[in-house]
């Protein structure tokens, strides 16, 4: 007798090991960088703050937090069908993102060990945190009779090269938006405990503080490198990364609105709250933030949401490959145009809040 609960439509490398999700523009990326340039950075303009953050990392507040308790010791077969599939996809995306951070931070710690020991230790301790997160999420997947082969993921993924300053922008925003995502879900479920369908969400309050501390580290790094914040190019790049991170989250989450509905959340409202909070937080270090309260911002993102629905419909059709490609061209062009217009929207200058050593 086939147990359909165990395998809700997932491909497997081998029994119980899920094939990693196909890489797309919206899936978590794996990064590498110029390690020599990173090692040569002068961090003296903000060394005191970096040393204070290192001391926080050494304390390891969450050393005993990621321990599964008795609330996990039950069958989860009642989470079935589409809900089960959406939940496993959520765990996979989260695990992949955390594991990506682990690999980057671990390699930075190794490469900088003899050249910049302060930064090396910070990166090693952050990799410790990310490894815990990824392992905890992967263990959660096993409750649904699946897991990820993280060794296979390490070898099979394509790595995106970013210069150090782009790593700073991207990882700062990734950590801070991760904080706001986790704490927003936690606070909602704290008020609505009947919507907590699985105990991993009960760990999010302490968990998100790791994300917050990691973000503070990259905040301090950028303040030690004023050129990443204080010239006209920095403003353009900050705008680009803010838009990229916000748009990626919005397009991903609206596509998976049913998952958030399982938690009693409305995906768009949730995303708008997270984007607003992350945008405000970024204003403490970035010279500009996005005008996310301008109706044009979400109107254009909604056009992209609609376009992506059309792209998925074309992929699901039985048309020949050439016909599919031709049908997609105007939709890709529309998405590109929406992002250009979003990028050109006037940002909000917050220079008075940024660029100075705290």
From Swiss-Prot:
Known EC number(s)? 1.14.13.81
What the entry lists under SUPFAM superfamilies is as follows:
Ferritin-like
The GO molecular function terms of this record are: iron ion binding; magnesium-protoporphyrin IX monomethyl ester (oxidative) cyclase activity
For this protein, the record's InterPro entries field holds: AcsF, Ferritin-like_SF, Rr_diiron-bd_dom
The pathway it acts in is: Porphyrin-containing compound metabolism; chlorophyll biosynthesis (light-independent)
Q: Which UniProt keywords apply?
A: Chlorophyll biosynthesis, Iron, Metal-binding, NADP, Oxidoreductase, Photosynthesis
Query: Transmembrane stretches, by residue range?
Result: none
Required co-factor(s) are:
Fe cation
Biological process annotations from GO:
chlorophyll biosynthetic process; light-independent chlorophyll biosynthetic process; photosynthesis
> What's the protein called, per UniProt?
Magnesium-protoporphyrin IX monomethyl ester [oxidative] cyclase 1
Q: Which gene encodes it?
A: acsF1
């Amino acid at each position: 007798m086939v147990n359909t609960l165990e395998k809700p439509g997932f491909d497997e490398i081998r029994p119980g090991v899920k094939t990693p999700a196909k890489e797309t523009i919206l899936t978590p990326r794996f990064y590498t960088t110029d390690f020599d340039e990173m090692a040569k950075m002068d961090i003296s303009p903000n060394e005191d703050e970096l040393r204070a953050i290192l001391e926080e990392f050494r304390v390891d507040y969450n050393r005993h937090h990621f321990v599964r308790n008795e609330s996990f010791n039950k069958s989860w077969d009642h989470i079935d069908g589409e809900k089960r599939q959406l939940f496993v996809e959520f765990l996979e995306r989260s695990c992949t993102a955390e594991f990506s951070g682990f690999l980057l931070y671990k390699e930075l710690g190794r490469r900088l060990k003899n050249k910049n020991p302060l930064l090396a230790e910070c990166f090693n301790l952050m990799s410790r945190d990310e490894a815990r997160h990824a392992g905890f999420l992967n263990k959660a997947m096993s409750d649904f009779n699946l897991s990820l082969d993280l060794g296979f993921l390490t070898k099979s993924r394509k790595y995106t090269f970013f210069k150090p300053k782009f790593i700073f922008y991207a990882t700062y925003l990734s950590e801070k938006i991760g904080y706001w995502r986790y704490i927003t879900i936690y606070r909602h479920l704290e008020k609505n405990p009947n919507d907590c369908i699985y105990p991993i969400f009960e760990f999010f309050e302490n968990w998100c503080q790791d994300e917050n501390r990691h973000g503070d580290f990259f905040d301090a790094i950028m303040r030690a490198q004023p050129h990443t914040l204080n010239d006209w190019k920095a403003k353009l790049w900050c705008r680009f990364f803010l838009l990229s991170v916000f748009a990626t989250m919005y397009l991903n989450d609206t596509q998976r609105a049913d998952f958030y509905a399982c938690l009693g959340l409305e995906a768009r409202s949730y995303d708008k709250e997270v984007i607003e909070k992350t945008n405000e937080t970024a204003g403490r270090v970035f010279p500009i933030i996005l005008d996310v309260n301008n109706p044009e911002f979400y109107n254009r993102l909604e056009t992209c949401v609609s376009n992506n629905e059309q792209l998925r419909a074309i992929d699901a059709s039985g048309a020949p490959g050439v016909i599919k490609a031709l049908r997609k061209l105007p939709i890709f062009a529309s998405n590109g145009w929406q992002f250009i217009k979003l990028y050109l929207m006037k940002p909000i200058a917050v220079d008075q809040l940024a660029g100075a050593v705290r």
